[in-house]
């Protein structure tokens, strides 16, 4: 009886300790998602006839050393990427770097439809955002540039070639749209246990079919891809031939291109080598592949 009593007491104590530990773990990271020490300013700008709404987050003292203009990856992202950006933004703010991010076209308070945009459209939008920030910090030492992820790899090079950012940071970007699709699908087939020979044949067949629909002389017939919504089909039609190769050597400002060696979306080895080759004449370039890191 006494042993049973103590076992119940110990079990209850263990449960309380577990709950307390979980509460401590989760609440200790809540500050990563709050901007209590930041100064927030709502800003709007116009691109391609769309009014776009965003937020400029400033360090608590209101005087940043730099401003990072955020370029989203794929998907219907708001200015905070459904709060997924918040820990990163707080890290930048703690380092004295302000952040400007806006709702994608048609998301949140922004007009338009992001699925109707080409990568060139997105680059034009990025330049408009950069120009707005540069006007706010004219005749100051504040450094202003781009910071983007994944699909931003097709946006930032074009934007940086058309404007004068102080820096560009590209994380997990691909150079060629078709090559990225082949890499991504090839890994999926490998995970399914298909042989290298089968994968090669499947990828060749898919490439030919995609070229027939989305290529330069493709049919552009949405009926041939019933798995896509009309908007998504239009997005792929506009971007299927995207290739950052011509723009990368023309980028202005310092360039930092970063990949994770274990990226399952983008071929880190191939794309980092391409950046090194294309930017070999730019002394203000750094290309890094982090081991044991993903997309």
Model-based region annotation:
Residues 29-62:
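N-terminal cap/lid segment of alpha/beta-hydrolase-fold proteins
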Residues 64-73:
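Short beta-strand element of the alpha/beta-hydrolase
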Residues 77-88, 104, 269:
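The serine-hydrolase catalytic nucleophile loop
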Residues 89-109:
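Conserved alpha/beta-hydrolase
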Residues 116-137:
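Alpha/beta-hydrolase active-site loop
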Residues 169-250:
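Accessory cap/linker subdomain of secreted extracellular hydrolases
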Residues 251, 257-259:
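Short beta-strand/loop motif that positions the catalytic acidic residue
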Residues 253, 267-278:
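Short alpha-helix in the alpha/beta-hydrolase fold that links the catalytic acid
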């Amino acid at each position: 009886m006494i042993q049973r009593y103590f076992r119940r007491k110990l079990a209850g104590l263990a449960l309380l300790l577990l709950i307390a530990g979980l509460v401590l773990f989760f609440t200790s990271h809540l500050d990563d998602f709050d901007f209590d020490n930041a100064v927030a300013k709502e800003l709007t700008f116009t691109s391609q006839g769309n009014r776009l709404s965003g937020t400029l987050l400033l360090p608590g003292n209101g005087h940043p050393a730099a401003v990072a203009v955020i370029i989203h990856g794929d998907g219907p992202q708001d200015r905070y990427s459904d709060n997924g950006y918040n820990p990163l933004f707080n890290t930048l703010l703690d380092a004295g770097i302000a952040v400007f991010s806006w709702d994608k076209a048609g998301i949140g308070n922004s007009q338009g439809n992001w699925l109707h945009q080409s990568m060139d459209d997105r680059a034009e939008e990025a330049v408009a955002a950069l120009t707005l920030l540069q006007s706010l910090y004219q005749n100051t030492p504040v450094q202003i540039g781009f910071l983007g992820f994944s699909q931003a790899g097709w946006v930032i090079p074009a934007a940086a070639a058309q404007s004068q950012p102080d820096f560009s940071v590209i994380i997990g970007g691909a150079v060629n749209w078709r090559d990225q699709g082949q890499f991504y699908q090839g890994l999926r087939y490998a995970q399914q246990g298909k042989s290298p020979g089968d994968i090669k044949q499947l990828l060749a067949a898919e490439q030919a079919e995609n070229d027939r629909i989305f290529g330069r002389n493709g049919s552009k017939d949405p009926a041939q891809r019933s798995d896509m919504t009309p908007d998504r089909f239009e997005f792929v039609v506009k971007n299927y031939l995207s290739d950052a190769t011509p723009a990368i050597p023309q980028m202005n400002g310092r360039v930092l291109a970063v990949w994770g060696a274990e990226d399952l979306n983008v071929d880190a080895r191939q794309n980092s080598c391409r950046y090194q080759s294309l930017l070999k004449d730019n002394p203000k370039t750094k290309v890094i592949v982090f081991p044991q890191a993903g997309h």
